[in-house]
Amino acid sequence: MDESALLDLLECPVCLERLDASAKVLPCQHTFCKRCLLGIVSSRKELRCPECRTLVECGVDELPSNILLVRLLDGIRQRPRKAGDGGSAGNSTNALRAQGSVTTNGGLNDAQNTQSGQQRIQARSPPVRGVPQLPCAKALYNYEGKEPGDLKFNKGDIIVLRRQVDENWYHGEINGIHGFFPTNFVQIIKPLPQPPPQCKALYDFEVKDKEADKDCLPFLKDDILTVIRRVDENWAEGMLGDKIGIFPISYVEFNSAAKQLIELDKPSGADTGEGSSGTSHSGNSQKQADAKKNTKKRHSFTSLTMSNKSSQSVQNRHSMEISPPVLISSSNPTAAARISELTGLSCSAPSQDMNPPLLPPPPMATPVITSASSGAAAVAQRNIIGPVEQVPHLRTSARPSVFIAIYPYIPRKEDELELRKGEMFLVFERCQDGWFKGTSMHTSKIGVFPGNYVAPVTRALTTATPAKVAMATATTSNVVNLVTPTPPGAPCQKLPVSGVEFAKTSSTNGVSPAGVPGCHIQTSPQSKVLLHMSGQMTVNQARNAVRTAAAHSQDRPTAAVTPIQAQTPAASALPQQAAASQQVPPPLSAPAAYINAAMNISRPSVPAASAASSALPTAAFEAESSWKSSSGLSGCSFSENVSAPLNSAANKQDKDSKKEKKGLLKLLSGASTKRKPRSSPPHSPTQEVEQTNSEAAAALEGAVGPDIVPVIVNGRAAPCTVDCDSVSASTPAQDNRKPASLDNNIPIAPPPRQPCSSLGSVLNDSRPCERYRVMVSYPPQSEAELELKEGDIVFVHKKREDGWFKGTLQRNGKTGLFPGSFVENI
């Protein structure tokens, strides 16, 4: 409180003039000026308290003075003299001494009451400088000033603080002179008051439907808003001019006072335990805000582009620019339910690339296919093999992606994750403000982190040297990696892929590394669709799928997995395999059943084998030694016979697969989606392209030379030569073994999983497309999204459940994702 306001309170209740040291206090403890009390006695012949009418029996001169009032006035009078130049009380340039001169140079007598009107005017003059009620500091040293504009003072002077320039400089005033001075030259007696909670607009925020959004507070960029309170996780209430409304937190930058207010008003339902984040409570904030705002405006989440900017400015997070406000009003309310389901996600989940290209046609002879993501391969190389938790309720509409930290990040809030450079993260939600929500594949913790600190991990060409490590990485993730066998003693090569180096090593024990050399696994287009479902299955569901697949395989010839030899394979091996597959398989132990189902399975049932292989628990690794010793077999003894009987058998299988497709779809979709059963998995827009590619591959299969092995790297075909003599030399007894024998040193890899086709390019899609016009421009938040400009025409291929569309932009021919609320059908 400044001095003028304080002196306004020290006034007589009768005459409303300022009290001085001559004021008297009555026995009832009410204080009045002496002049008023004398006037009452002279007119009434008695003295009663004007406030409570209590009779006073003594005279006015006998009444005591108010000690507290005297001390207060004394302090106001004496304080300015310490800041002066040593006793210059009569200096007229010092307004502070002019006000203090009311009670100086003489006793406090009744004659001064005649000057009360003049004193009252002086009391309401500009604030006294240096009084304790004002922010002030005491000079510890003499400061002469080094530049024009600096404030000069001597040791012991009292300086009134006006504002703080930064942590090292203040702007203050002394004796009517303003200037700057360093902080370390003074001692703060009373600090500056906290600034009001305000925020600065980073983007324009406009509302289209003023009737529906009447409680929103529109503003322009660089506007200064006064923050009133926090409404929920994503919205705050503020004032601009004479208007009060709510606005998105991600559109503004708060000052220090507003940050504290936002933190204090944080929703009480926010979890502080591991795996929690502010984004996972949008369901609670929705209930709280229904009375004030449309439900959709409260949730800034979608399955691909979401928002966790609730305290973005509080911690100075670096977020991506979003100019149109429709991003918030058009977000999907059902995303909150999906987020709550994903809060229990562990360190293991199927990984997908941001924008994987289409797979080329299956080659005649491909190397061993090992399911291991780049993050899992790194874990396996450190010999960290532990139990892998399963994700039973992960839906295909929210496929997680693997990212790698390219910069370190220290968390500033409880719901944030620490990023270490090179650490792998599984991202299952991406926010509209550029923040990601995911889980660390190293610590299994769940939280949010800045998206510009990580980069997507693409598929890599890698080899796992020990068989046990290869099995461990096979169950960690479902990203397809192709392993190229190399002869013994080959040097170690490192292949840089997207800034991350993965070691490509070869075995030194004379056995082809990490699997069966050159085994060829073919899948039909139907099975590729089923792979999406099988990749999400739990262990028990995978076991049931394996048993079902084994039961179905006895009615159809098996020609999917066949060995490759250096010479042209004999055609007589095919009937032998077909005859063997007609027999009912005997009961096997759990590991043997998985391997039998993975190796002896027909084309339509390959997805079931993929589910079984990709969902193998750690218990299968422990039982590895038992079935190795019981089998007593070594080497790869499967041969592939590319001949007319094989092609005719494959054509027959395609017909049979169409009949049983619906049954398998219902079986797998019912087992993998308990919460939301559906009759078929989501339709892949690239299914027709892949089917065409696989049919073309069957026609071109015989034209490929035996020494040329196409290798799939990041979804593209690349030539790679393999020395068939060295491959066959590593397994000298290969030609003499039966087709059903297994190598006790070779782990069985699951079939390749179809890439995330919902994010791939759909340039050859033959389905009818709908034409949409862009209403509001949309800046892309990731590589998988399209940049929309107002007036653009988009051909929509697919509409997703979360409100996002997939289509091709007519302007540049690019294909990607975009929010459906930004376009209208034409």
UniProtKB/Swiss-Prot annotation:
Pfam families: SH3_1, SH3_9, zf-RING_UBOX. The keyword Transferase applies. Residues 80-130, 266-319, 647-694, 725-759 are annotated as: Disordered. It catalyses: S-ubiquitinyl-[E2 ubiquitin-conjugating enzyme]-L-cysteine + [acceptor protein]-L-lysine = [E2 ubiquitin-conjugating enzyme]-L-cysteine + N(6)-ubiquitinyl-[acceptor protein]-L-lysine. PROSITE patterns: SH3, ZF_RING_1, ZF_RING_2. InterPro entries: Endophilin_SH3RF (IPR050384), SH3-like_dom_sf (IPR036028), SH3_domain (IPR001452), SH3RF1/SH3RF3_SH3_4 (IPR035816), Znf-RING_euk (IPR027370), Znf_RING (IPR001841), Znf_RING/FYVE/PHD (IPR013083), Znf_RING_CS (IPR017907). It comes from the Eukaryota. Signal peptide: none annotated. CDD domains: RING-HC_SH3RF1, SH3_SH3RF1_1, SH3_SH3RF1_3, SH3_SH3RF_C. A zinc finger (RING-type) spans 12-53. Residues 652-663 have a biased composition (Basic and acidic residues). GO terms for biological process: negative regulation of apoptotic process; neuron migration; positive regulation of JNK cascade; positive regulation of proteasomal ubiquitin-dependent protein catabolic process; protein autoubiquitination; protein ubiquitination; regulation of CD4-positive, alpha-beta T cell differentiation; regulation of CD8-positive, alpha-beta T cell proliferation. Belongs to the SH3RF family. PANTHER family: CAP, ISOFORM AC, SH3 DOMAIN-CONTAINING. This is E3 ubiquitin-protein ligase SH3RF1. The gene is sh3rf1.
